[in-house]
Amino acid sequence: MVYSYTEKKRIRKDFGKRPQVLDVPYLLSIQLDSFQKFIEQDPEGQYGLEAAFRSVFPIQSYSGNSELQYVSYRLGEPVFDVQECQIRGVTYSAPLRVKLRLVIYEREAPEGTVKDIKEQEVYMGEIPLMTDNGTFVINGTERVIVSQLHRSPGVFFDSDKGKTHSSGKVLYNARIIPYRGSWLDFEFDPKDNLFVRIDRRRKLPATIILRALNYTTEQILDLFFEKVIFEIRDNKLQMELVPERLRGETASFDIEANGKVYVEKGRRITARHIRQLEKDDVKLIEVPVEYIAGKVVAKDYIDESTGELICAANMELSLDLLAKLSQSGHKRIETLFTNDLDHGPYISETLRVDPTNDRLSALVEIYRMMRPGEPPTREAAESLFENLFFSEDRYDLSAVGRMKFNRSLLREEIEGSGILSKDDIIDVMKKLIDIRNGKGEVDDIDHLGNRRIRSVGEMAENQFRVGLVRVERAVKERLSLGDLDTLMPQDMINAKPISAAVKEFFGSSQLSQFMDQNNPLSEITHKRRISALGPGGLTRERAGFEVRDVHPTHYGRVCPIETPEGPNIGLINSLSVYAQTNEYGFLETPYRKVTDGVVTDEIHYLSAIEEGNYVIAQANSNLDEEGHFVEDLVTCRSKGESSLFSRDQVDYMDVSTQQVVSVGASLIPFLEHDDANRALMGANMQRQAVPTLRADKPLVGTGMERAVAVDSGVTAVAKRGGVVQYVDASRIVIKVNEDEMYPGEAGIDIYNLTKYTRSNQNTCINQMPCVSLGEPVERGDVLADGPSTDLGELALGQNMRVAFMPWNGYNFEDSILVSERVVQEDRFTTIHIQELACVSRDTKLGPEEITADIPNVGEAALSKLDESGIVYIGAEVTGGDILVGKVTPKGETQLTPEEKLLRAIFGEKASDVKDSSLRVPNGVSGTVIDVQVFTRDGVEKDKRALEIEEMQLKQAKKDLSEELQILEAGLFSRIRAVLVAGGVEAEKLDKLPRDRWLELGLTDEEKQNQLEQLAEQYDELKHEFEKKLEAKRRKITQGDDLAPGVLKIVKGYLAVKRRIQPGDKMAGRHGNKGVISKINPIEDMPYDENGTPVDIVLNPLGVPSRMNIGQILETHLGMAAKGIGDKINAMLKQQQEVAKLREFIQRAYDLGADVRQKVDLSTFSDEEVMRLAENLRKGMPIATPVFDGAKEAEIKELLKLGDLPTSGQIRLYDGRTGEQFERPVTVGYMYMLKLNHLVDDKMHARSTGSYSLVTQQPLGGKAQFGGQRFGEMEVWALEAYGAAYTLQEMLTVKSDDVNGRTKMYKNIVDGNHQMEPGMPESFNVLLKEIRSLGINIELEDE
């Protein structure tokens, strides 16, 4: 493998055996591609804004004299960039401008004569834009739109599995689900009649729909039944015979023809009888007259002579009717063929319960069901039915729906109209009846072929269409009002409804979520999340077990492991690593094609529906050099079942062993050795890890760390290759390689880094360069590490030396004993940044004022404020300190005589304002790292605001001029090259000032042209610089657009350093979580023979019952990795020659049976080997991919190479006594995470505080400054102890005895510790409730 200069700094040893056929795809593509589809111009008009416009426009006036046509649209440039939007608290969006054409037709002239055309560009609101990382900035906060897994449009056949009716009879139903429009359900009832429901309303007999479609009874029977024809000849009744229909029947008379008896009366008819009848070509048999009684007539029979109806279609025949028919000359009678086995009489029975008999009555019936209480008219009934399923505006199956619909009904074509046709409805009914008759199967709703993904773009498009439809109504009204000659398109379009619909979706939809920004992994997982909840989806309460379960079709599409615990389990899932959506929105996963028994590298993406037709081998099947399967029988999946197949039956093979799991689960090493429940917790807890002060790459990883870190967008990645020309903490400058430059550009890339910014979860986002001056970089190399990344690899926690042993009960019940060294080295110290805002409003009594002149506040409290009343940057503040001084005017109060006297003596005290300053919340302390002041336009800026403004201007100017210098230097070096090549001497040039270079003339025509081009570029550069500076200056100095009534906002940012302490929650990656019980002095920790103490002691009893053995293997492998690092460290300390180092490191990389990774250190220069060794000192990082990881033998070999015992256990000594523990202990390195459940955020104590309004009991929870609940179980405990007085105190004065508690407070203040319990308020509430039932209870005093 070829490594770039940056990648050679640290190479992770990979234990994977299976070749990597397909690289991990870009992990955010599901979000970015979907939104791109929404925004980009689509000439076909299939997707996005274009599709929405085309579906609503052209809008015609009611009279048809004018119409508004859509021409095209364009998105403008956003006003602020992403960072500015976050600081200012506005939405990152672009204005949408639409070109519309108003066409007015002549009234009197023939159809289509145009009188006037006006075209105009109209503003239609703002469209929020997606950032490069797949998020949206809405009102200054980053949000993610989660994709939704919903039921695909189409037709579904299902059954109630016998649960509806008490008899346990299975009732079948069919449901046509459109993309938008009314649902149409067909269902059987226990009596086998077929009913229809529209939009889940009252059910009607299904034949009503057919009658409404203008079918007569005769035509309906014709559609659904085969005929049995009887003929009357010579007073004998004969029946046309179709032998196949007799199968399984019992003959009720002798079946004979041509004098030969084929079946005797009472015998069952078998296949042999049928063969004989067919062989002899028997067409007619004689039947007894009684046989026809009870048969159902298939059409109307009319007496020709009188014109009266003898019997109507769907009537049962009797012998009387037969005689009448015979008399009136009907010798050929058609009846319906039904039997109990596979031709039920369902439609015929349904027609009997159908109250309607023609189209109009059917339409009226449907109208009454949809609009109860309204008087039906013919027009209303017709238009209602027409609009339900047959109007393009109200009903749309969508391309997906039509495809699924036609596939389900086994039709050839998969495209078609978006509305229903007569045939569609009849075919659905036919298939439902077939299923009831035992032919065909019902669908599986949880199959991923029946559920599809709706992503951002699609949902935004739907919302946008909703807004457009609202506008459409207004435009129609406007077009009908006349005065069209003066009307322009922009007078008709009101952008409010459109932007309101879009804003509502991005701001408050259930699927628009506040981004989880704990660490890069939680960001990436949030964007790849798939929810079954949300509008048009399921609800938590209604979802049963089946929907939440892992389905065979999830394989490679949805992760079976990563889902939340709790009420949402199984409803919120995560996309698998390689999964993507196809054009219809179904999830598909890649497979390698197998051709003639050879596994090729050709990749096919298969959806769940297609996958069912193939036999697919597992990724870990063994192959030989040519790509044949080694074993004769291969474990494969087919139709959702796993079993053995012979190797020539295999069609496809999995791409990778990690294709089953999601990104989160693919980061757990030795996942294959963990129980699934614990793996779920492990995957979920990695997302809660807080970024530590110094990121530390995991010694034992899975090889996915780099992909996650780079794709999450928290690192700075080189867009083009080049050389590092300048680097400091806040910017990196790359001089681009010649071959990657665009013609006519300076060839300089500048990367500005993010410094100490607050994330959504109050963690700290900070980027640090990881390249040095003069280093070569290639495209895609990581230039700067972000939070939780280390040299471009995800690093969520720290590698800790752990021992599995009990230690004095301090690791009882998953507690964790931690060494003080961990605190000293700041291993788990994290920085949290809090934003505190102070808003100055305009009140009725006058404006609030931000000032340092606050009434009744001592000097000490103001010591940290400047003269504007705003805290200094760098000030250390604690709970209760003032950050921003603010006073609010208050109304005049009545003064007491004493106050009046004091006023008169001491002059006017500022009595008309009250202190409403912003103070630091209790329990928070930290350093002020930034202050921002936003002032409304037209309000005078205070001194501090002007200072901040000046500083920002200075910084912007400095940044831009530095940028200009860098670009100029690049340009002049090229000018110099041209001049020297054109014959100007280098010494002469260096004496001239640079500006004069461009005035020199060259004899060579071509070189002179180049020089002129460069001179143009130089002018353009300077012009561009001026323009940028002016734009920046305008943005900084202009007033801010604040909410109505707000004059000023001051935001202060506090950085809080949190060290690890008892009560903090920690976890490994295998679901092994615990709480720190004690921080132990280093000298008391167990130590080994070299005197190295362990950092963390874990309870060995936490492993066996939880079955997450992965943590033990990780510990052993971590030990081996560290051992090799220690050996390299020793060699570096002894300053051994490079050859020895190279040889040892090469041995480590080559270790392991047939691993895929080949590292050839002979291609590395000595300097590169030394730098690699330097980076391996702390341990050699190892990758053990999921389901393809290191084997036990390989771990032992690695331990041996590091001169460590192969058992993985060593002798430990007690730090307090120095005695050896009685048996060897498992010691190694485990990657531990500090989770965002910090004791500082949870600790809370109440003395007195707020009470609930009705019950008068203290509130609960830290946010309300609430008390601790003393629940019924606690009451039982005190009762059991007989602690009556304690219990009385708990239930009265400490809770809701209002008078008692105020007296108690007074008593304690007076130093008298007696209580007088009274009546708890809850008892009064109970009395009131009983009285509300009409029972009067009164309390009597004794």
UniProtKB/Swiss-Prot annotation:
It catalyses: RNA(n) + a ribonucleoside 5'-triphosphate = RNA(n+1) + diphosphate. One of its GO terms (biological process) is DNA-templated transcription. The keyword Ribosomal protein does not apply. Keywords: Acetylation, DNA-directed RNA polymerase, Nucleotidyltransferase, Transcription, Transferase. It is an enzyme of class 2 (transferase). SUPFAM superfamilies: beta and beta-prime subunits of DNA dependent RNA-polymerase. The modification N6-acetyllysine is found at K1022, K1200. The keyword Cell inner membrane does not apply. GO terms for cellular component: DNA-directed RNA polymerase complex. The gene is rpoB. This is DNA-directed RNA polymerase subunit beta. PANTHER family: DNA-DIRECTED RNA POLYMERASE I SUBUNIT 2. DNA-dependent RNA polymerase catalyzes the transcription of DNA into RNA using the four ribonucleoside triphosphates as substrates. The RNAP catalytic core consists of 2 alpha, 1 beta, 1 beta' and 1 omega subunit. When a sigma factor is associated with the core the holoenzyme is formed, which can initiate transcription. It comes from Shigella flexneri serotype 5b (strain 8401). GO terms for molecular function: DNA binding; DNA-directed RNA polymerase activity; ribonucleoside binding. InterPro entries: DNA-dir_RNA_pol_bsu_ext_1_sf (IPR042107), DNA-dir_RNA_pol_bsu_external_1 (IPR019462), DNA-dir_RNA_pol_su2 (IPR015712), DNA-dir_RNAP_su2_dom (IPR007120), DNA-dir_RNAP_su2_hyb_sf (IPR037033), RNA_pol_bsu_bac (IPR010243), RNA_pol_bsu_CS (IPR007121), RNA_pol_bsu_protrusion (IPR007644).
